[in-house]
Structures are given as structure tokens and as C-alpha cells.
Amino acid sequence: MGQSKKLNKQPSSLSPLVQLAGIRKCFDGKEVIPQLDLTINNGEFLTLLGPSGCGKTTVLRLIAGLETVDSGRIMLDNEDITHVPAENRYVNTVFQSYALFPHMTVFENVAFGLRMQKTPAAEITPRVMEALRMVQLETFAQRKPHQLSGGQQQRVAIARAVVNKPRLLLLDESLSALDYKLRKQMQNELKALQRKLGITFVFVTHDQEEALTMSDRIVVMREGRIEQDGTPREIYEEPKNLFVAGFIGEINMFNATVIERLDEQRVRANVEGRECNIYVNFAVEPGQKLHVLLRPEDLRVEEINDDNHAEGLIGYVRERNYKGMTLESVVELENGKMVMVSEFFNEDDPDFDHSLDQKMAINWVESWEVVLADEEHK
């Protein structure tokens, strides 16, 4: 959201590595992916993001060759791999369970794929140790999986996946089993490792924060379809529809009705009972219903007294939560709607905290809002 600034768009010079064209997949007669087209570029960290059952893991398994498409084509480096068996694709997968062999040492787990490929014996030790160095586990080579922490097991699984030097690494919710602190650490390590290796990563998650943190590009999915495809900043600041807006982070959705268009950019509208100017980049008519979307951190609040004449939306503080860097307040508007406001904490301001039931005026910087048509009344 926010200022009309250039977002961190992907460079257009990236070359395609994987192309999915017209992909359709059914399970037990139920269509889970009706028609999907997706291009994954060389060297990027792409995340498939969506709620449970949206089809993201199915897409991953189709790329890996663990499921077969009902129709459509999958290309890897301009080669049609639609019907190529999984073991013959230069693609490796790290599963949520890691799937390490418990009776083997870390070294043997990582070496397993090389032995299966009949790699010359003289190459195995240097390649395994190189992979373990990449994930900072070279001193753990002789340990068994049960002697490792969850984060270390995850890194062994990644080392085992990259030792074969795949063109593409697929990760299926592979951080979800870790505790919060370790998950944050592994997010940073995984992104740094991807940059170091230069391998294309495709990561599946339902965790929005994880996707925003790690990805070069995010593909938001729902019911087997792509809802939006863009950089993390584009997805967060310029959601294309209400589903994406509501799924990615906290957001306030205000109901609005068009009064009149003022100029090419601005529209006068009734927003939750108050007249405001909003920026609308599509054609509207008087009386048309709209949604005005604003992140909690994009709202500006001011304490007012009963006799103050204030601009903006008027409400009362019903909850306030100190979060360290921020103060989060829930403000109830005069029409009963609850609004979330997030302010950066100012320890030098003794009046920064708000009392419960304090009357507030809510405003925002013009053009920071995202305005969408009402999908029910188009």
C-alpha cells in the first residue's frame, strides 16, 4: 500500500526454467487444478502460497513427477518432461518429514543419491563434504539423524537434495515442524543458501510471513487457481482482490459508496458513514459500492475530545496491545465496525499510549489506500 512508489519488480531478463502450460489435475473425479499456467525462472526463489487444499502441493508433486497431469505440459529447460519419470528429472524434493534414513549416518544419508546414480567412488566424499559445508554440518558427518536437532535434520535433508546438483529444488512446507525461533533462523539460512547455490527453489507454504520473508516471487493460490503472481511487496501493497488482501497479513476493509469522481485519480466517496477522497484507478459510477483497503500501519490516529470537529473516521479505543516495537489498538467506529491500528512505539512520548474508550479520529495519507470493486455487486 502506501505511496505511489515503484515496487521491487522482478527483472524482466530472467530466463524460464520451468513452464507449466494448461495443467489440469483431478483426484477421484474431483478437479483440484482446473487450468494452470505458470513460468518459474532460473535462479529465483518462488513460493506457492495458499490455504490448505488450494492445490499448491499438487503443483509441486506434478513438477517433481510424483503425480501425473491429466492434461497440459511441463517443460524443464525447454525439454518436455510431462511423462518423464521422477528419477529422470533433474529435480529434487525436500519433504515436510525430511525422510532421512534413521540407520544411516549424516554422511551416508547425503551420499545415498550419489551412490544410486553410480557416481565414481572418488567423487563421493568430496561432493558430500562440500554439500555438508554449505549447510554448516561438516563436523556432524558421522552422527545419526536421532542425534540431531530439528533444524540440523532439515539442513541434512537440504544437503542430500543439493548434492546431486539439481536444476530445481522443491520444498514442501519443510519449515513447518520447527519451533518459531528456529524457523526464523532457517528462513534466513535457506534464502542465503539459495543465493549461494544459484539453484531455483520452489517453496510451498501456507505461512504468509514466511513467504514474504524468503521469496523473490510469490504465487498466491486458491482452489487450484492463481489469484496473484508478484514480488512480496506487490502482493502485500497491491493486492488484486479481496482474497489476496485478506490472506496476506492484517488488513482493514472499509465499505464505501461513490458520490462523484473529482478528477482522473480521485473519487469523493462515503466511507463507513464519512465523506472522504479516495484514489480509484478504474471507472466508477455514483452509487457504486467499493472496498477501501488499508493496512494497520498505514492508518494515522489522533485523540479527540467530544467537542472537537475532526476529519476522518471517528471511533473509540476498545483494545490496546503493546508489542514492543508497536502499539496495536482496536478502534470501534461509530457504526460498530472494528478497525486495527498499528503505531510504532515512541518511548519519548509520555502520552503515546491510548486509554480504553478514548475517542479517536482515523485518517490516512491520500493514495496509500487500495480500492477494489465490490465483487458481489460488479
Swiss-Prot record:
The keyword Transferase does not apply. Disulfide bonds: none annotated. One of its GO terms (cellular component) is ATP-binding cassette (ABC) transporter complex. InterPro entries: AAA+_ATPase, ABC_SmlMolc_Importer, ABC_transporter-like_ATP-bd, ABC_transporter-like_CS, Mo/tungstate-bd_C_term_dom, P-loop_NTPase, PotA-like, PotA_ATP-bd. It comes from the Bacteria. The keyword Cytoplasm does not apply. ATP binds at residues 50-57. It is found in: Cell inner membrane. Its EC number is 7.6.2.11. Residues 18-248 form the ABC transporter domain. PROSITE patterns: ABC_TRANSPORTER_1, ABC_TRANSPORTER_2, POTA. It is a peripheral membrane protein. It catalyses: ATP + H2O + polyamine-[polyamine-binding protein]Side 1 = ADP + phosphate + polyamineSide 2 + [polyamine-binding protein]Side 1. One of its GO terms (molecular function) is ATP hydrolysis activity. Keywords: ATP-binding, Cell inner membrane, Cell membrane, Membrane, Nucleotide-binding, Translocase, Transport. Belongs to the ABC transporter superfamily. Spermidine/putrescine importer (TC 3.A.1.11.1) family. Part of the ABC transporter complex PotABCD involved in spermidine/putrescine import. Responsible for energy coupling to the transport system. NCBIfam families: potA, PRK09452.1. The complex is composed of two ATP-binding proteins (PotA), two transmembrane proteins (PotB and PotC) and a solute-binding protein (PotD). This is Spermidine/putrescine import ATP-binding protein PotA. It comes from Shigella sonnei (strain Ss046). The lineage of its organism: Bacteria, Pseudomonadati, Pseudomonadota, Gammaproteobacteria, Enterobacterales. The gene is potA.
